[in-house]
Curated annotation (Swiss-Prot):
Active site: 108
Database matches in InterPro entries: 6-PGluconate_DH-like_C_sf, KARI, KARI_C, KARI_N, KARI_prok, NAD(P)-bd_dom_sf
UniProtKB keywords: Amino-acid biosynthesis, Branched-chain amino acid biosynthesis, Magnesium, Metal-binding, NADP, Oxidoreductase
Binding site for substrate: 252
Residues the entry annotates as binding Mg(2+) 1: 191, 195
Organism encoding this protein: Methanosarcina barkeri (strain Fusaro / DSM 804)
Gene responsible for this protein: ilvC
Every KARI C-terminal knotted domain range: 183-328
Protein name according to UniProt: Ketol-acid reductoisomerase (NADP(+))
Record's function text: Involved in the biosynthesis of branched-chain amino acids (BCAA). Catalyzes an alkyl-migration followed by a ketol-acid reduction of (S)-2-acetolactate (S2AL) to yield (R)-2,3-dihydroxy-isovalerate. In the isomerase reaction, S2AL is rearranged via a Mg-dependent methyl migration to produce 3-hydroxy-3-methyl-2-ketobutyrate (HMKB). In the reductase reaction, this 2-ketoacid undergoes a metal-dependent reduction by NADPH to yield (R)-2,3-dihydroxy-isovalerate.
Length: 335
């Protein structure tokens, strides 16, 4: 079982006299920077000179520098850039400014685990990964609570990497909800698996296939959308709040019996084998290699799939339905 650390077990001592550079000011970046700053820690933000976020970060009361300047000024450097951009920025702007005893931090282990970034041996390397999007990390912090987070130490050059990681997650509010210790390998492989197999890939494919099945059978697309997509949130919220048991307890007996008897026929042994194959490709690095190569040529496959998704009938119908629901929260975190 994972070890869980709470607020009363941690202090800010390991970061008290250090400067923390947050590289990036997107969804996670703005939340980390503002939470750490409001926790009384010394925070700077590293951005490109041309970044539209420069003025935003300054307006939020933060000191902003270029990435290279921030790396040179900082003791702890948290890289909160897209996975595919991290290595190039690291080698061109961060690595030349690293000093022995500095700490490199990540919110996801992809680049370290798959050796896209190979840090020098004389710096600490740790992970601080909140299990929620940036706007939730920020909102819950301001409410006096927080979201759970993961920590991991990949390299402990100073002998103090774990304490720095714990002070960091305390600063973003995560210890209020509980912090779980893991490894870079475990976080990376389980995170990618979840994204691909159920949270993003599996769920979206299940929704689209169910929608297409109803429409092909002659049902109105609007009815198909409500039953296969719109109501997903109702079910997911129940699971999020109380697990599968809460969900089964809350739905009708008809839904419970039908779901329990038919569900295993849909997600069956063939599906399980496909999941094992997806996990194998994550573990052996095949997926990482494919993704890195795709990024090197500016993501042509991803862009084509995004266009196809946007044109899918489910998306067209869904957009029309959502436009007619005035109370629906349509806030999108573009970052």
């Amino acid at each position: 079982m994972a070890k869980i650390i709470y607020d009363n077990e941690t202090t800010f001592d390991a970061l008290k006299d250090k400067t923390i550079a947050i590289m990036g000011y997107g969804s996670q970046g703005h939340a980390h920077a503002r939470n750490l700053h409001e926790s009384g820690l010394n925070v700077i933000v590293g951005l490109r000179k041309s970044s539209s976020s420069w003025a935003k970060a300054e307006n939020d009361g933060l000191k902003v520098m270029t990435v290279a300047e921030a790396a040179k000024a900082a003791d702890v450097i948290m890289i909160l850039l897209p996975d595919e951009n991290q290595a190039s920025v690291y080698y061109s702007e961060i690595a030349p400014n690293l000093e022995a005893g500095n700490a490199l931090a990540f919110a996801h282990g992809f680049n370290i685990h798959y050796n896209q970034i190979v840090p020098p041996k004389d710096v600490d390397v740790f992970m601080a990964a909140p299990k929620g999007p940036g706007h939730i990390v920020r909102r819950t912090y301001t409410e006096g609570i927080g979201v759970p987070a993961l920590i991991a130490v990949y390299q402990d050059a100073t002998g103090n990497a774990r304490e720095i990681a714990l002070s960091y997650v305390k600063g973003i509010g995560a210890t209020r909800a509980g912090v779980y210790e893991t490894t870079f390998r475990e976080e990376t492989e389980t995170d990618l698996f979840g994204e691909q197999v159920d949270l993003c890939g599996g769920l979206s494919s299940l929704i689209k296939t169910a929608f297409e099945t109803l429409v092909e059978a002659g049902y109105q697309p609007e009815m198909a959308y409500f039953e296969t997509c719109h109501e997903v949130k109702l079910i997911v919220d129940l699971i999020y709040e109380g697990g599968l048991e809460r969900m089964w307890h809350s739905v009708s007996n008809t839904a419970e019996y039908g779901g329990m008897t038919v569900g295993p026929r849909i997600i069956n042994d063939e599906s399980r084998e496909a999941m094992r194959e997806a996990l194998k490709r994550i573990q052996n690095g095949e997926f990482a290699k494919e993704f890195v190569l795709e990024g090197m040529v500016n993501h042509p496959v991803l862009k084509a799939m995004e266009r196809q998704e946007k044109e899918h009938q489910l998306e067209v119908v869904g957009k029309q339905i959502r436009a007619n629901i005035p109370w629906l929260n349509r806030e999108i975190d573009d970052d």
